Structure formats: structure tokens, C-alpha cells
């Protein structure tokens, strides 16, 4: 059983570093696991703090039995039973062992235990394999899209034009 707990400010820099490694450093990883459509960082300290300042925002960390940081996820309680999932991250050297599925299930259970009725997220539309991974876990595309934040390098630098996000949702 995965025990998620609220991250402390002292853990933010480690969380940022792991997120950027997992999302943006393709060395030794298969393409679907990294955002090769976007260069640069995935998150920085100012963006993380801005996100966590939003009402209902939580940054949850998962440490293994030895205390090693294994993964983390950001969840936002958007009210009325809706939760938003972002930055689901498993330490790159621990991927391919089902830990992503385990962390996702723990995040869903966390939201459900707090009245969550549905989980939403956004995924870059062009990342078909990642969308498929979430669809195999019960998420569906809602038909809604959101624009990619071109020009805001806090999210990274797109390597091509035309990126946007699909909104995915799952009943909890």
C-alpha cells in the first residue's frame, strides 16, 4: 500500500529536480515517458509555488520503506467532487515496475477519501502513448482542449507548433 503525505517546503527542490529528470531527460528512457516535444524544464520553483498557492492544491510525496523519494503527484481539489491531477512522477530509475499505476491509484484513493467523484487532467494531445496509458486506467477524453502556454518558458520550450492539451476524466 502506498502512503502519500503532504510534501514539505524542504522537499520542493528534490521534487522539482526529479520531475524535470522524469519528464525531460530522455537518456535511457522510451519516448512515451518523456516529453520530447518540449525542451527545457517541466517545472521550476516559482511555478510550483504558484500552483500550490491555489486553493485546494496539494503536493503529495511517496517514499519507499527505506525512506527514498519514489514519486510524487500534485492534486487540486476543484470543488464539487472534481479533482485535478498533475505532475504524476516516478523516479526514472524505478520506472517500468508498475509504480506509476500504483501512484495513480493512490492519488485517486486520496481524492476519493476526501469526497472526490471524478479526476481530471490535461495531457499534450500529441503524446498518444501517454494518453493511451491513462485510457487503459479508465480515463476518457472529454472532447475539451486547452491551449499550450507558448511563450511561458516555465513550462518548457515547445519544439514544434500546434501543441495543445486534451482534457481527460475518470469517475472515481
Regions found by a protein language model. Name each.
Residues 20-49:
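Conserved GNAT-fold acetyl-CoA-binding loop/helix
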Residues 44-61, 161-164:
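A short helix-loop-beta-strand connector motif used in the catalytic cores of GNAT acetyltransferases and
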Residues 117, 124-131, 137, 144-172:
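C-terminal "cap" of GNAT-fold acetyltransferases
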Residues 90, 96-109, 136:
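Conserved acetyl-CoA-binding loop-helix of GNAT-fold acetyltransferases
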Residues 3-17, 24:
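A short beta-loop-alpha structural element at the N-terminal edge
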Residues 63, 88-95, 123-125:
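A short, internal acetyl-CoA/4′-phosphopantetheine-binding micro-motif in the GNAT/acyltransferase core
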Residues 61, 68-76, 84-89:
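Conserved beta-strand in the GNAT
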Amino acid at each position: 500500500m502506498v502512503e502519500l503525505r503532504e510534501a514539505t517546503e524542504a522537499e520542493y527542490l528534490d521534487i522539482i529536480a526529479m520531475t524535470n529528470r522524469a519528464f525531460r531527460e530522455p537518456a535511457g528512457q522510451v519516448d512515451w515517458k518523456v516529453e520530447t516535444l518540449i525542451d527545457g524544464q517541466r517545472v521550476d520553483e516559482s511555478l510550483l509555488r504558484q500552483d500550490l498557492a491555489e486553493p485546494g492544491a496539494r503536493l503529495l510525496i511517496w517514499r519507499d520503506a527505506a525512506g527514498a523519494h519514489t514519486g510524487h503527484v500534485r492534486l487540486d481539489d476543484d470543488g464539487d467532487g472534481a479533482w485535478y491531477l498533475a505532475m504524476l512522477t516516478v523516479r526514472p530509475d524505478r520506472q517500468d515496475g508498475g509504480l506509476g499505476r500504483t501512484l495513480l491509484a493512490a492519488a485517486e484513493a486520496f481524492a476519493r477519501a476526501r469526497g472526490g467523484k471524478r479526476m481530471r487532467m490535461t495531457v499534450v494531445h500529441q503524446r498518444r502513448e501517454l494518453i493511451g496509458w491513462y485510457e487503459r486506467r479508465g480515463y476518457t477524453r472529454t472532447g475539451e482542449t486547452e491551449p499550450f502556454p507558448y511563450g511561458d518558458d516555465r513550462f518548457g520550450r515547445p519544439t514544434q507548433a500546434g501543441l495543445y492539451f486534451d482534457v481527460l476524466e475518470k469517475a472515481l
